[in-house]
């Protein structure tokens, strides 16, 4: 949603999306394309370019919160850290949250806890 051309594609204000939260994501599909999983996924270069958030960062983007767990697989941590770094490199507002003691599957539970650092960042993003 954050990379959609809302004005060009839908006639809406370019800033219709005011912020975004991404948790424990894969932001570049090239490692999957290069892995044995691609034998059944059939991800080609066009799909990598089209479906990788890291490769779709627009010039204008809403503030983002990128969260990941301390105990996640290294690849998920790397994806999150590199995506957050690339957003900042392009001068986009980005809050990076490394959640102590959590794994990939526990990250979704953080959205149900108003006191979690991830939800606190969400609240700050929307101004409450």
Stretch-by-stretch model annotation:
Residues 60-61, 65-69:
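Short beta-strand/loop motif that positions the catalytic acidic residue
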Residues 29, 71-75:
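Acidic catalytic loop of the alpha/beta-hydrolase fold
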Residues 52-61, 78-79, 110:
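Conserved serine/cysteine hydrolase catalytic core
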Residues 16-18, 62-63, 92:
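Loop/turn elements at helix/coil->beta-strand transitions in domains of secreted/extracellular proteins
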Residues 67, 77-84, 88-128:
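C-terminal catalytic histidine-bearing segment of alpha/beta-hydrolase fold enzymes
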Residues 42-55:
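Alpha-helical scaffolding within the catalytic cores
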Residues 1-38, 48-49:
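Primarily recognizes the serine-hydrolase "nucleophile elbow" in alpha/beta-hydrolase
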Residues 11, 55-56, 88:
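A general structural signal for stabilizing positions within well-ordered secondary structure
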